[in-house]
């Protein structure tokens, strides 16, 4: 079966931080967007988020015809998805909610239209169990801010067609993203599993009084974080092995993985630990508002992405390599 990959109308269900990021990205790529969210005040909040993201998108470069005015907010699921060429759901992470939602979405959508979910914690075989034409249903898990970060993890369920996964990856690429096919259904997929391991270690370091939240963030942003933005973990460690490469690195440093100085279980989230984390991050934030920090983050991301793209091209690499 073939699926629609030429997208003119993008349907978005859920308009919170993630959903609005999808909407802003689709608008910036010159698409018409139809959005639905049953929460009170959702439309006004959505339009404000899109407006806040637009300066960064303008700096990155808008597609011909891209305009915030091409967003239409509707009152029903059926009106949202009925004429859509691609559907992205970004609803709260509740299995019962997603089961019902996708039964309704899939019943109202054309059978050759792909349906993606932004879920980070649920598996597609579970929440697409009652969907019509489940062969076109999958996960497209993005990262915040969705309108700037290119990574999207694409995960198929037990009944997802292989062609649907390939088609979805083409659609996401057309939106300027770097789709990553997750080969097996596994909780947390790829990136969040890595991030959760780091998060657990960070909480232990705060809980044990080893470092403040600011010091831990400094350890990442002035160290490994800079390398990760263009090289990743495995290639970084390959270089650490010198001319002998990864095999030498594994032989030299592999035994250290058995040392008992790292934690795998998360620390107990006591009130004292929560207070310490909240107080530390409040000190880091200072007097800056969340909106100010979002604009700062967006400008930094644009600068980093631009520098990486330019440097890779100079060395003969494509951006996705």
Curated annotation (Swiss-Prot):
Entry keyword set: Cytoplasm, NAD, Oxidoreductase
Induction of synthesis: Highly induced by carnitine via the CdhR transcriptional regulator. Not induced by glycine betaine or pyruvate.
Catalysed reaction, written as an equation: carnitine + NAD(+) = 3-dehydrocarnitine + NADH + H(+)
Annotated pathway: Amine and polyamine metabolism; carnitine metabolism
Cellular compartments annotated: Cytoplasm
InterPro entries to which the protein is assigned, alphabetical: 3-OHacyl-CoA_DH, 3-OHacyl-CoA_DH_NAD-bd, 3HC_DH_C, 6-PGluconate_DH-like_C_sf, 6PGD_dom2, L-carnitine_dehydrogenase, NAD(P)-bd_dom_sf
Activity vs pH: Optimum pH is 9-9.5 for the forward reaction (oxidation) and 7.0 for the reverse reaction (reduction).
UniProt enzyme class: oxidoreductase
Disrupted-gene phenotype: Cells are incapable of growth on carnitine.
Coiled-coil residue windows: none
Example of a GO biological process term: carnitine catabolic process
Segments crossing the lipid bilayer: none
Thermal dependence of catalysis: Optimum temperature is 35 degrees Celsius for the reaction in both directions.
Primary location recorded for the protein, binned into one broad class: cytoplasm
Activity regulation, per record: Analogs of L-carnitine such as D-carnitine, glycine betaine and choline, are competitive inhibitors of L-carnitine oxidation.
GO cellular component: cytoplasm
Family: Belongs to the 3-hydroxyacyl-CoA dehydrogenase family. L-carnitine dehydrogenase subfamily.
Matches recorded under PANTHER family: 3-HYDROXYACYL-COA DEHYDROGENASE FAMILY PROTEIN (PTHR48075), 3-HYDROXYBUTYRYL-COA DEHYDROGENASE (PTHR48075:SF5)
Protein task: Catalyzes the NAD(+)-dependent oxidation of L-carnitine to 3-dehydrocarnitine. Is specific for L-carnitine and NAD(+) as substrates. D,L-3-hydroxybutyrate, L-lactate, ethanol, L-malate and D,L-isocitrate are not substrates. Is involved in a L-carnitine degradation pathway that allows P.aeruginosa to grow on L-carnitine as the sole source of carbon and nitrogen.
Protein name: L-carnitine dehydrogenase
